[in-house]
């Protein structure tokens, strides 16, 4: 008998942990336990969390996003968040990962989404748009991509971050800032159909979302092979465990319910294509995905996780909740009216969740209010 590969061993171990839960007593969405977990994460964190010092901006966003998608984000939490994000402001217009650190494009993305969620003039005023614009230009590469900082890497995450935050603060997608960016992103589509972090690398669920969302904002979805992309996205749902994986021959992970799930929504909605033609339904089984998240990703003490037997964390709580929102509603995009959504057939199981914008990763409405604010502000740059 042939020896099993490491991949096969890990898949068997995952199935052994997942299947008893998947086939066990039916679980409902446990709102109160998740709120208890999120409330606890607002307390001072113990010393092991010091390893996440450079992820402060992200921890603020994950907390705010989770509370917001549950409709439980209040002004007192926003005031604390504004104070925290203010300490992360850098000298050039970007935001840092932690206090006193260098500005970083991904930390800037997380900080601006947090500002968006705080939904107030006090929060919006933390963004110095003209300085941010100059800083983004300083990170631009000749090939159209963006570095995360002056000496950092360039990939689909950093490009999406640049495009996304620019869109939120009123920088046009036709601005010279994005010359060559769409072309660079489209080179990231692989022979499998998904998109990679950089051209000619392996397709990945997280990078696919980042590249696809940026391409959609730039209006270039027609440049992709959508049939191959859709096929690859369908293949991300495990046929036995029903969760999504991030790559071929990789394990299911609750966070991909958003990275892959939102990618399905973008493609099906028609947003970012010339025709804006929407499809009648998604290409995967949302009911089975719901089962995986509710049965296997909910911790008994609250919060959500990658997969059993792992512990819950802020990252997976945030993106599992966003993933659940993506199946709680049917999303469409209309040229004249913009985005619309209505409860899906699964909504009754997830009625405490608000609809999430598949591009901006915040509940609908927040993105429009920050855009309106910056459209009313004068700029010397554009």
Swiss-Prot record:
Needs which cofactor? Answer: Zn(2+)
Recite the UniProt cofactor note for this protein: Binds 1 zinc ion per subunit.
Per UniProt, where does Zn(2+) bind?
A: 253, 255, 316
Listed GO biological process terms: protein localization to plasma membrane
Which parts of the sequence are marked as the site Important for selectivity against geranylgeranyl diphosphate?
Answer: 58
Q: Which UniProt keywords apply?
A: Metal-binding, Prenyltransferase, Repeat, Transferase, Zinc
One Pfam family assigned to this protein is Prenyltrans
EC code: 2.5.1.58
Q: Which GO terms describe its molecular function?
A: protein farnesyltransferase activity; zinc ion binding
Tell me the residue numbers annotated for binding (2E,6E)-farnesyl diphosphate: 204-207, 247-250, 256-259
CDD domains found in the cross-reference section: FTase
Which reactions does this protein catalyse? L-cysteinyl-[protein] + (2E,6E)-farnesyl diphosphate = S-(2E,6E)-farnesyl-L-cysteinyl-[protein] + diphosphate
The terms describing its cellular component in GO are: cytosol; nucleus; protein farnesyltransferase complex
User: Which sections of the protein are PFTB repeats?
Assistant: 78-119, 129-170, 178-219, 226-268, 286-328
Q: Which domain of life is it from?
A: Eukaryota
Q: What does this protein do?
A: Catalyzes the transfer of a farnesyl moiety from farnesyl diphosphate to a cysteine at the fourth position from the C-terminus of several proteins. The beta(cpp1) subunit is responsible for peptide-binding.
In the record, the note on similarity to other proteins reads: Belongs to the protein prenyltransferase subunit beta family.
PANTHER family membership = GERANYLGERANYL TRANSFERASE TYPE BETA SUBUNIT, PROTEIN FARNESYLTRANSFERASE SUBUNIT BETA
Assembly, per entry? Heterodimer of an alpha(cwp1) and a beta(cpp1) subunit.
Q: Which protein, by its recorded name, is this?
A: Protein farnesyltransferase subunit beta
Q: Which organism is it from?
A: Schizosaccharomyces pombe (strain 972 / ATCC 24843) (Fission yeast)
């Amino acid at each position: 008998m042939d020896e099993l590969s490491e991949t096969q061993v890990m898949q068997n171990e995952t199935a052994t942990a997942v299947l008893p839960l998947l086939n066990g007593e039916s679980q409902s969405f446990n709102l109160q336990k998740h709120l208890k977990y999120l409330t606890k994460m607002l307390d001072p964190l113990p010393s092991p969390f010091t390893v996440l010092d450079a992820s402060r901006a992200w921890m603020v966003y994950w907390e705010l996003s989770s509370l917001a998608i549950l409709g439980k984000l209040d002004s007192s939490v926003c005031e604390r968040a504004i104070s925290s994000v203010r300490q992360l402001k850098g000298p050039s217009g970007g935001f840092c990962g932690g206090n006193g650190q260098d500005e970083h494009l991904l930390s800037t993305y997380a900080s601006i989404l947090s500002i968006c969620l705080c939904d107030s003039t006090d929060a919006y005023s933390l963004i110095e748009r003209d300085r941010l614009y100059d800083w983004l230009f300083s990170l631009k590469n000749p090939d159209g991509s963006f570095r995360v900082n002056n000496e950092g890497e360039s990939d689909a995450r950093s490009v999406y971050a640049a495009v996304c935050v620019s869109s939120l603060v009123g920088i046009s997608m036709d601005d010279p800032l994005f010359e060559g960016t769409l072309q660079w992103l489209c080179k990231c589509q692989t022979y499998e159909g998904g998109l990679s972090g950089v051209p000619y690398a392996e397709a990945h669920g997280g990078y696919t979302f980042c590249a696809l969302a940026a391409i959609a904002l730039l209006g270039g979805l027609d440049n992709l092979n959508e049939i191959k992309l859709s096929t690859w996205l369908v293949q991300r749902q495990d046929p036995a465990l029903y969760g999504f994986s991030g790559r071929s021959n990789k394990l299911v992970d609750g966070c991909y319910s958003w990275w892959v799930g939102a990618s399905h929504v973008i493609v099906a909605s028609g947003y970012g294509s010339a025709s804006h033609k929407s499809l009648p339904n998604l290409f995967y089984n949302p009911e089975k995905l719901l089962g995986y998240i509710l049965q296997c990703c909910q911790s008994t003490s609250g919060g959500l996780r990658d997969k059993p037997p792992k512990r819950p964390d802020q990252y997976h709580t945030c993106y599992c909740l966003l993933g659940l929102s993506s199946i709680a509603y049917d999303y469409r995009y209309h040229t004249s009216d913009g985005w619309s959504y209505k409860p899906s057939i699964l909504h009754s199981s997830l009625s405490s969740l608000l609809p999430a914008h598949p591009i901006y990763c915040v509940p609908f409405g927040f993105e429009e209010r920050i855009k309106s604010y910056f459209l009313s502000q004068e700029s010397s740059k554009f």
